[in-house]
Amino acid sequence: MEVIYNVKKFLLTLTMMFILMTNVTFASDAEYLLNSVELTPMGTGFEPCDIAVQETLSRITDDSMSTYEKIRACYDYLIDTCSYGSNEERHKYLSYVPDDLVGAGRAAGMLEGHVGACDDYSCAFAVLARAIGLNCYTVYGQTSRARGGMTGHIWTVINVNGTEYVFDPQIDDNISKGGPTYYYRFCKTYNEVSGCYVPASYDKYGYFHSF
């Protein structure tokens, strides 16, 4: 039994070392990419959302941080403080916002209430990233399920020089389940997460679009 235990412990150690090495390599690539982008900060035009965004950014970022550090701070913030469920806070905004500001209403509700579904996570991340200056927008389509098959989903991408990089805090939050975050869906090309996403041929919701 002791031999079996030691073998399991050894294998677990190897697994953790592999994850750590993978994250370090990934961080280096993502850092170089995001820090190379010329920033164009953009608000939503919906005051409650823009106020929530600036209050959030003032708490979790500062001027000494690089673009990569700010984006990772936003991603971590959503994973660490939000949970999957019904975004009740959005209702006070969606009752009166025009169709082109529904995404901003969802984002405001998520940043205030910290509970929401995939579109709420994505809208919140999009407004934070756009305020920093990155060309971030939501994508509607399907994603793979852990138990097999596909399901409807909304995620975000950041477009850098015509290449879309997936950022999906809701899925990474679900994978982490309160444990360490391994960033499986952070700054990944569709090829790097092959089979995980199928963008729809049309935009069903139209929350946010490319600059």
Where do the language-model regions lie?
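Cofactor-/ligand-binding subdomain signature composed of acidic, glycine-rich
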Residues: S36-T44
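Sec-dependent signal peptide cleavage junction
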Residues: M21-L34
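Hydrophobic/aromatic-rich core segments of domains that either
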Residues: D120-T189
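Bacterial N-terminal signal peptides
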Residues: T13-T22
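Bacterial N-terminal signal peptides that target proteins for export
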Residues: E2-L12
